[in-house]
């Protein structure tokens, strides 16, 4: 009888370990499958690419390795790489027509990606604000109103027009878009000085501070990311993308508005909804003592409700 109990105990113990081992094996297989599906392999550096109509070749070791670094970086910056594509679905439909209207190549929209991560509320520690990250003085010099009450660096359309003015001016000076991009980071005075000192005509051939040197290659890497996210290991569904929320109407304002909370209620929206749609309104009132003309967007409150069946995909490459 004792032997029977002992043998039964051994069998039960063997059965337990067999079941436990099989469960561990199944967990390991699932884990291996998960990592196999989510492990990112950076895309290879291409032989060349076209950016804003200019052909850049990567057959020189320094150019190739600088590009490789940024491709690797964007492959593993999961949070930012995911967010910028989600946000682009909402913002690019607004930005692209403005660039086209002002004669700026479409590829220059990627400046916004590396400047602000496509966050319209972005404010750097240095004081640069909005999608295009204008400093106060620079914003004013390109036609933006910047003060405590109104800050048009946060106005998506007006700041994009201002960016177009800067880019067109810089292109007139340099004649190639990669040098224009470098000047957006390093300033026109700084880049012009380096070109003169080093006897070059293209910023890709300059010895620059690390940030500006990397900036140009980050720009090209971002273009590759947006053209084919899957190559970087990122996949999206329609439900993942942020929908464009159009304004229900635009209100022309030429007089002061003492209370924007009341103004919002009169137009059927909350103060928070009004502010989200008009980030350039920095206070709870609009002074406008000079009776300038402002366009205040009244959001479509129904469009703010999440309905993926109505989401328009701006670029089909993002969900393939």
Q: Which sequence ranges carry the predicted segments?
A:
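Short, functionally critical alpha-helical segments immediately adjacent to catalytic or ligand/cofactor-binding
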Residues: 104-121, 180-185, 274-277
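Extracellular LysM carbohydrate-binding repeats and other cell-envelope/extracellular binding modules
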Residues: 273, 277-317
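Catalytic and binding regions of secreted/periplasmic enzymes and modules that target cell-wall glycans
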Residues: 167-194
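Second-shell loop/turn segments in exported
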Residues: 74-85, 95-101, 119-128, 145-157, ...
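Catalytic cores of secreted or luminal carbohydrate-active enzymes
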Residues: 210-233
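Primarily a LysM-type cell-wall glycan-binding module
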Residues: 238-268, 292, 319-320
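Substrate-binding/active-site groove segments that recognize
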Residues: 126-147, 160-162, 167, 191-194
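An acidic, Gly/Ser/Thr/Pro-rich helix-cap/linker signature
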Residues: 3-10, 18-103
């Amino acid at each position: 009888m004792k032997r029977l109990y002992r043998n039964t105990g051994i069998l039960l113990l063997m059965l337990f370990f067999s079941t436990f081992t099989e469960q561990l094996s199944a967990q390991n297989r699932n884990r291996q499958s998960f990592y196999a599906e989510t492990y990112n392999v950076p895309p290879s550096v291409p032989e060349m690419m076209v950016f804003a109509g200019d052909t850049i070749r990567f057959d020189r070791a320094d150019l190739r390795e600088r590009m490789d670094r940024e491709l690797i970086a964007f492959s593993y910056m999961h949070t930012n790489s995911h967010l910028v594509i989600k946000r682009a679905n909402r913002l690019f439909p607004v930005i692209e027509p403005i660039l086209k209207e002002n004669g700026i190549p479409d590829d220059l929209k990627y400046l916004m990606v590396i400047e602000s991560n496509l966050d319209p509320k972005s404010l750097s520690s240095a004081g640069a604000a909005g999608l295009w990250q204008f400093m106060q003085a620079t914003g004013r010099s390109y036609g933006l109103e910047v003060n405590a009450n109104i800050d048009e660096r946060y106005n998506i359309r007006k700041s994009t027009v201002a960016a177009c003015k800067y880019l067109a001016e810089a292109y007139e000076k340099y004649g190639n878009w990669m040098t224009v991009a470098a000047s957006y980071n390093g300033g026109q005075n700084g880049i012009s000085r380096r070109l003169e000192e080093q006897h070059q005509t293209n910023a890709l051939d300059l010895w620059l501070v690390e940030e500006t040197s990397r900036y140009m290659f980050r720009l090209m890497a971002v273009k590759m990311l947006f053209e084919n996210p899957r190559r970087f290991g990122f996949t999206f569904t329609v439900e993942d993308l942020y929908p464009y929320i159009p304004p229900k109407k635009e209100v022309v304002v030429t007089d002061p508005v003492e209370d924007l909370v009341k103004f919002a209620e009169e137009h059927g929206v909350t103060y928070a909804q009004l502010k989200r749609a008009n980030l350039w309104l920095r206070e709870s009132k609009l002074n406008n003592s000079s009776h300038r003309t402002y366009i205040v967007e009244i959001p479509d409150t129904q469009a703010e409700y999440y309905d993926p069946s109505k989401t328009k995909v701006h670029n089909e490459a993002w969900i393939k």
